[in-house]
Amino acid sequence: MLELRFIRENLDLVQERCNRRGMSDELITSFTEIDQKRLSTLAEVESLKNKRNVASKEIAELKRGTDEQKLEAEPLILEMRQIGDKIKILDTSLNQIQEDLDKVVMAIPNLCQDDVPVGNSDEENIELRVWGKKPEFTFTPKAHYELGEEADTIDFERAAKISGARFAILKGFASRLDRALTNFMLDLHTQKHGYTEVLPPFLVNSASLTATGQLPKFKEDLFAIKDWDLYLIPTAEVPVTNIHRDETIAEQDLPIKYTAFTPCFRSEAGSHGRDTRGLVRQHQFNKVELVKFTTPERSTDELESLLGDAEEVLQLLGLHYRVVKLCTGDLGFSSSKTYDIEVWLPGQQKYREISSCSNFLDFQARRGGIRYRPEGQKKSKLVHTLNGSGLAVGRTLLAVMENYQQEDGSITIPEVLKPYFENRF
């Protein structure tokens, strides 16, 4: 979230950046009204408390005086009781006003950086570069779901029987390919890119989701555990970022770089009718996540290196892709700047997002109380957090299937994955 004082002192800037995202003036107008109400109520409470303090001293003096002076204290005592009752009422009102203000502040998105293009939808994202070439086929390439169903390696029908729509069962080759991709990604990120592998919980509490920005705004996208303050994770970003919630990190320990493989669970609210076939949009999917904690001075460079780490996965797999910079209308709530990597899918004749790499600046750190202590200084500062997919395993799997398909429906294994397919028993 943004700092309360910053919002108050930079209302025009905050409003302008919200407008860039396609938001109306309503949220910031509401903030101004509630904040002014809070300040006026607070001023009234302070005035009454000062009046009570002055009167209390006067009453104490009168009580030490003559009988006549003691009688003069009685109406003052009565008045102070009335003031005390009014202060209690105003304090209750102030607590409610503060709650209302906190809700508004939590609903204000991160400020997009200056170089983020202004636009309304993903159609206005900016293509920055492409890597590799689209594969050429002597036959009409099929979509992954056709390949999987024909080879009996992906079963959507039985998955629907077990769990409903937007689930899949991987079998045989597809299941092994999924595992090979996961191990390849983790090996690359830990052995070459310098990340520490972690295996976090797959259930998180509301405080964790609030810190990373999923709550309260995106509650409908989450799977909640009834009667528990627990939710299935929508991404490993949530538990991994919260490893250092309410902690102060020594500057010499930064940057901290984590990678984690987890299943992810999303309700896909608002996606009715979109990508109903295949593995592109599932309620449950696997992902390798990359998370960084760094200093403000380093976060810009760390975003570029994070993007490079994700890109190398596709480069080693020999998959054609492009990098796009998200426009303001497509930017995530907590992000200040995001690059998407979109892989080419010949069976669908389109690019599909396979990774989002984002810099959150201190937005998540403020919500989660994640700080660092600069070397030689007593006062701590907020860290900057970043994360990205390295990569979404299911989408990488379908990209390999579609790009490496043969005319007979078989799939050629990319060279870099062959060691993971060697039989050991």
UniProtKB/Swiss-Prot annotation:
Domain notes: Consists of two distinct domains, a catalytic core and a N-terminal extension that is involved in tRNA binding.
InterPro entries attached to this UniProt entry: aa-tRNA-synt_IIb, aa-tRNA-synth_II, aa-tRNA-synth_II/BPL/LPL, Ser-tRNA-ligase_type_1, Ser-tRNA-synth_1_N, SerRS_1_N_sf, SerRS_core, tRNA-bd_arm
Function: Catalyzes the attachment of serine to tRNA(Ser). Is also able to aminoacylate tRNA(Sec) with serine, to form the misacylated tRNA L-seryl-tRNA(Sec), which will be further converted into selenocysteinyl-tRNA(Sec).
Major localization class: cytoplasm
Pathway the protein acts in: Aminoacyl-tRNA biosynthesis; selenocysteinyl-tRNA(Sec) biosynthesis; L-seryl-tRNA(Sec) from L-serine and tRNA(Sec): step 1/1
EC number in record: 6.1.1.11
Keyword Ion transport set for record: no
GO CC aspect terms: cytoplasm
Transmembrane helix listed as a keyword: no
Coiled coil: none
CDD domains from the UniProt entry: SerRS_core
Highest taxon, organism lineage: Bacteria
Pfam families linked to this entry: Seryl_tRNA_N, tRNA-synt_2b
Oligomeric form and interacting partners: Homodimer. The tRNA molecule binds across the dimer.
Protein's UniProt name: Serine--tRNA ligase
Positions with a binding annotation for ATP: R266, S267, E268, E353, I354, S355, S356
The protein's enzyme class: ligase
UniProt organism field: Desulfotalea psychrophila (strain LSv54 / DSM 12343)
Keywords in alphabetical order: Aminoacyl-tRNA synthetase, ATP-binding, Cytoplasm, Ligase, Nucleotide-binding, Protein biosynthesis
Cellular compartments annotated: Cytoplasm
Reactions this protein catalyses: tRNA(Ser) + L-serine + ATP = L-seryl-tRNA(Ser) + AMP + diphosphate + H(+); tRNA(Sec) + L-serine + ATP = L-seryl-tRNA(Sec) + AMP + diphosphate + H(+)
Family from the record: Belongs to the class-II aminoacyl-tRNA synthetase family. Type-1 seryl-tRNA synthetase subfamily.
A molecular-function term among this protein's GO annotations: serine-tRNA ligase activity
Residue numbers binding L-serine: T235, A236, E237, E289, S389
Gene Ontology biological process terms, A to Z: selenocysteine biosynthetic process; seryl-tRNA aminoacylation
